[in-house]
């Protein structure tokens, strides 16, 4: 450039004004980056800069601005992109022919130097994207591992890996998987394709050394084959790290390790594993990325990552290796399955199939005794934990005696203990809720819980002799929740309980027989999983079952109320009016078979989850922010692609 005061040489062109530098924000559904480019920059040049940040080939990038796809030859000024505006980025999937999978055996066995970060040229060759991707391998496409950055579908697979070790064992034993995992170079390249791992290796070279060591990769794959060994190794390592704090200088080593290695690694996969188990409650609301590590001595012990967050410390006592907590099972299904509680109940019946038969025998004996003609003065007392049957002197079955406090008894048919009423009385055990359910045992039919909460659902006696002063109550009666003389006849729940149980006894007997058959149990689980998929993918088809359910409910609800066999011939004088509200159609629905009622719950209890608009609300907002304003077209595209925003954008482009 000519200095000030000097004339330009003759024949030289006139000075051209420098292009204006602008700042463009590139936003993806999960990330956002800022780029400083000139306004004359073409879209192709911008894609090349974006590909270096997002580790993707420029041909995979699609830039969207104001609802339009930006073309490569156009400049930013021609597209109307000005300083401070946002351009949306969509990374397309990798589509290649199956013939590119053949050179898998030609992967070099020696990787880069330890700690070195592979260059973009080594990750993306000149002829296209990487030659290896799980999305191209036959048999693994259903696992969803072709998505970049491990989206939500593999996260559910990882949660199953933690909670169901048998699933991983079956997956590893598949003949195709060992051949895939035996190629350590392929596994290393698959891991390096993750942008989070790229950034982690850049800041921590020792992780790159681990990935470049084939022996460590082989040992890791062997641990995957044996989940018990892997869990024991992790527990032993945690004990060593906990003892490291007591060694002089060990606290500084722990601070460095957790700040520089553990926290970035766990935060990188936080969406997949549900959070950082090493983060304490005091640091949940703090920003760990900007805060400096404290140089003070740690006075608090490190948190135990193996402690369950759903229950107390005593919930893990006596737990075996193959056991699972009920909240862990419920987290793998949508919220409406938490209302039905069918999977939990089938799981418990599978673990102890004899419990249902024992309970049904005690229930059948109690019902047969209740149908006998009662005495003229006193009502027949219900079965209670006593050694003899009142009035007959015959010993009661041990099953019916212990059924009140048995944890394996179905919760929707169990009587509550006296501590649930808030007053004195014998306690059958801890962990009972207000309706007498065990807190870790779900209901089979949720409708019975509503009817059980209307009245004190306990084996109460309504003997008129108990209200006469000077006459003591029989010893087998429990402590009353309130004076028996004030208790109306209409509050006796025994007749209603009989009407509810008797139509379901044949079904429960068949259910017990099915629990002993592994194939039948697997079929029941497949039915539930099919209903889950149907409620998500085709909610309107599930609504089609409503006329059938309504007809079944009306037939079951039309059962005439019979006379109470437990009622005395001489009722109490001047009984107060009944306090029951009128039974509506929803409450009469529990008289229908449980599996039909499960379908009814899917439609009626939480209809918002069955609406596609509510299910894809977040994805619809993302598409609207990208400029796609046709909500109906966006919804149809999301339904067709299963909620994948990138695939929905491609479908909208083609339409």
UniProtKB/Swiss-Prot annotation:
Pfam families: UBA, ubiquitin, UBQLN1. Gene3D superfamilies: 1.10.260.100, DNA helicase RuvA subunit, C-terminal domain, Phosphatidylinositol 3-kinase Catalytic Subunit, Chain A, domain 1. This is Ubiquilin-3. SUPFAM superfamilies: UBA-like (SSF46934), Ubiquitin-like (SSF54236). Residues 110-122, 279-290, 377-395 have a biased composition (Low complexity). Residues 194-233 form the STI1 domain. GO terms for biological process: cellular response to stress; regulation of proteasomal protein catabolic process; ubiquitin-dependent protein catabolic process. One of its GO terms (molecular function) is polyubiquitin modification-dependent protein binding. Testis specific. The lineage of its organism: Eukaryota, Metazoa, Chordata, Craniata, Vertebrata. GO terms for cellular component: cytosol. Residues 432-441 have a biased composition (Polar residues). Residues 318-330 have a biased composition (Basic and acidic residues). It comes from the Eukaryota. Residues 609-655 form the UBA domain. Residues 102-124, 277-330, 364-399, 412-447 are annotated as: Disordered.
């Amino acid at each position: 450039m000519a200095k000030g005061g000097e004339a330009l040489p003759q024949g030289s062109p006139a000075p051209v004004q420098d292009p204006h530098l602008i700042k463009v924000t590139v936003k993806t559904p999960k990330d956002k980056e800022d780029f400083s480019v000139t306004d004359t920059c073409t879209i192709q040049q911008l894609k090349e800069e974006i590909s270096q940040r997002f580790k993707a080939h420029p041909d995979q990038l699609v830039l969207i601005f104001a609802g339009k796809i930006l073309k490569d030859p156009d400049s930013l000024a021609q597209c109307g992109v000005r300083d401070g505006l946002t351009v949306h980025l969509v990374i397309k999937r990798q589509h290649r022919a199956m013939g590119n999978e053949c050179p898998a055996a030609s992967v070099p066995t020696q990787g880069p130097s330890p700690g070195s970060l592979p260059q973009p040229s080594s990750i993306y060759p000149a002829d296209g994207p990487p030659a290896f991707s799980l999305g191209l391998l036959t048999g693994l496409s259903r696992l969803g591992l072709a998505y970049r950055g491990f989206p939500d579908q593999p996260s559910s697979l990882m949660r199953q890996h933690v909670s169901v070790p048998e699933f991983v064992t079956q997956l590893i034993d598949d003949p195709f998987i060992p051949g895939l995992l035996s190629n350590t170079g392929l596994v290393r390249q698959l891991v390096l394709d993750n942008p989070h791992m790229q950034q982690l290796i850049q800041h921590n070279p020792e992780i790159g050394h681990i990935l470049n060591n084939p022996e460590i990769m082989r040992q890791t794959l062997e641990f995957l084959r044996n989940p018990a060994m892997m869990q024991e190794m992790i527990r032993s390592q945690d004990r060593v790290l906990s003892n490291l704090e007591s060694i002089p200088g060990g606290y500084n080593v722990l601070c460095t390790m957790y700040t520089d290695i553990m926290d970035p690694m766990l935060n990188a996969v936080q969406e997949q594993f549900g959070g950082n188990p090493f983060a304490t409650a005091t640091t949940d609301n703090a920003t760990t990325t900007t805060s400096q590590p404290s140089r003070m001595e740690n006075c608090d012990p490190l948190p135990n990552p193996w402690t369950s967050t759903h229950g107390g410390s005593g919930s893990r006592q006596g737990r075996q290796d193959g056991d699972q907590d009920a909240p862990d099972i419920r987290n793998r299904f949508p919220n409406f399955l938490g209302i039905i509680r069918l999977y939990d109940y089938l799981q418990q019946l599978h673990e102890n199939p004899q419990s249902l038969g024992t309970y049904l025998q005690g229930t059948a004996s109690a019902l047969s005794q209740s149908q006998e003609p009662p005495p003229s003065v006193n009502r027949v007392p219900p079965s209670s934990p006593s050694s003899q049957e009142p009035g007959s002197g015959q010993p009661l079955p041990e099953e019916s005696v212990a059924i009140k406090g048995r944890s394996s008894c179905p919760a929707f048919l169990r009587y509550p203990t006296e501590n649930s009423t808030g007053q004195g009385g014998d306690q059958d055990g801890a962990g009972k809720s207000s309706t007498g359910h065990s807190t870790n045992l779900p209901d089979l039919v949720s409708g019975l819980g509503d009817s059980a909460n209307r009245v004190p659902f306990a084996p109460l006696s309504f003997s008129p002799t108990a209200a006469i002063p000077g006459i003591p109550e029989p010893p087998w009666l429990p402590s009353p929740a309130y004076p028996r003389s004030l208790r109306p006849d209409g509050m006796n729940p025994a007749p209603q309980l009989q009407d509810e149980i008797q139509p379901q006894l044949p079904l429960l007997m068949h259910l017990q027989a099915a629990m002993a058959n592994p194939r039948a149990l697997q079929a029941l689980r497949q039915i539930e999983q099919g209903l889950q998929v149907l409620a998500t993918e085709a909610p309107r088809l599930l609504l089609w079952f409503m006329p059938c359910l309504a007809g079944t409910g009306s037939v079951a609800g039309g059962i005439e109320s019979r006379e109470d066999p437990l009622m005395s011939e001489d009722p109490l004088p001047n009984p107060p009016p009944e306090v029951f509200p009128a039974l509506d159609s929803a409450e009469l629905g529990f008289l229908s078979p449980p599996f039909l009622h499960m379908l009814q719950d899917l439609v009626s209890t939480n209809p918002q989850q069955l609406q596609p608009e509510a299910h894809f609300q977040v994805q619809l907002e993302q598409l609207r922010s990208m400029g796609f304003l046709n909500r109906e077209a966006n919804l149809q595209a999301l339904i067709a692609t299963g909620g994948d925003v990138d695939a929905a954008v491609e479908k909208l482009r083609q339409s």
